[in-house]
Amino acid sequence: MNDILAKILAVKAEEVATARQMRSEAELLREAQARQDVRGFAQAIEDKISQGKAGVIAEIKKASPSKGVLRENFDPAEIAASYAMHGAACLSVLTDVQFFQGSHDNLRRARAACSLPVLRKDFIIDPYQIISARAMGADCVLLIVAALAPAQLRDLETLAIDLGMDVLVEVHDAKELDAALALRTPLIGINNRNLRTFETTLQTTLDLLPMIPAGKRVVTESGILKPEDVRLMREHDVQAFLVGEAFMRANDPGVELARLVA
């Protein structure tokens, strides 16, 4: 595990411990189970693709550790509405505070502004965070193979599914892909950014594609910056995209989405 990821995960452990003191897991679970408003995340992607369109998971994030602040004029509800208007299949909302300047409230506001399913984008290491995701309205959670042992992956996935959510499992290489393919989720996110060097290459997705069986939906993540990137991926039958930076830097994120997948 690289230093940046290890640092983030240490902060997450502290955050979970603090949150548990503020509110018990049992109480949070009651709130999560009481919500009957799950929007089908994986299905929304498939619906777009079945229409011959790209299945775009459009991301809402103010900043990142590697790039700093991406967007000064940051209104999650306004961005979400623009994404919905311009053809996004789903939203991804950063809820990490320290490294990405996100928040739980950003997710709530984005979800309330449209009818799209929403991914809680965070570094999940504990069941408490899965329960919290559903309680705040998330329809899908991200599990990062690099951050979790195989038993943790299975247990967290099972909990998410039991709460009605979908799971996007993220990999960076062939070894991580093996762990991801052992899970039930059809959503396999391939992150094109090297966790050690932070360099990005779309070749990562292309290299892993032959190892992925039918019945799984590949989501290519990071480095999708221009229409040619989308065309390259779709030529290789990669039809789902998680895009953040390109949209966040644009004057109108939704208009940029439409331009990217035109």
UniProtKB/Swiss-Prot annotation:
GO biological process, one term: L-tryptophan biosynthetic process
Any one GO MF annotation of this record: phosphoribosylanthranilate isomerase activity
Catalytic reaction equation(s): 1-(2-carboxyphenylamino)-1-deoxy-D-ribulose 5-phosphate + H(+) = (1S,2R)-1-C-(indol-3-yl)glycerol 3-phosphate + CO2 + H2O
Metabolic or biological pathway: Amino-acid biosynthesis; L-tryptophan biosynthesis; L-tryptophan from chorismate: step 4/5
This protein's record includes keyword Lyase: yes
A Pfam family hit: IGPS
Keywords noted in UniProt: Amino-acid biosynthesis, Aromatic amino acid biosynthesis, Decarboxylase, Lyase, Tryptophan biosynthesis
Record-listed E.C. numbers: 4.1.1.48
Extent of the signal sequence: none
Domain of life, source organism: Bacteria
Database matches in InterPro entries: Aldolase_TIM, Indole-3-glycerol_P_synth, Indole-3-glycerol_P_synth_dom, Indole-3-GlycerolPSynthase_CS, RibuloseP-bd_barrel
Annotated family: Belongs to the TrpC family.
PANTHER family xref list: INDOLE-3-GLYCEROL-PHOSPHATE SYNTHASE, TRYPTOPHAN BIOSYNTHESIS PROTEIN
Stated name of the protein: Indole-3-glycerol phosphate synthase
Organism whose genome encodes this protein: Bordetella parapertussis (strain 12822 / ATCC BAA-587 / NCTC 13253)
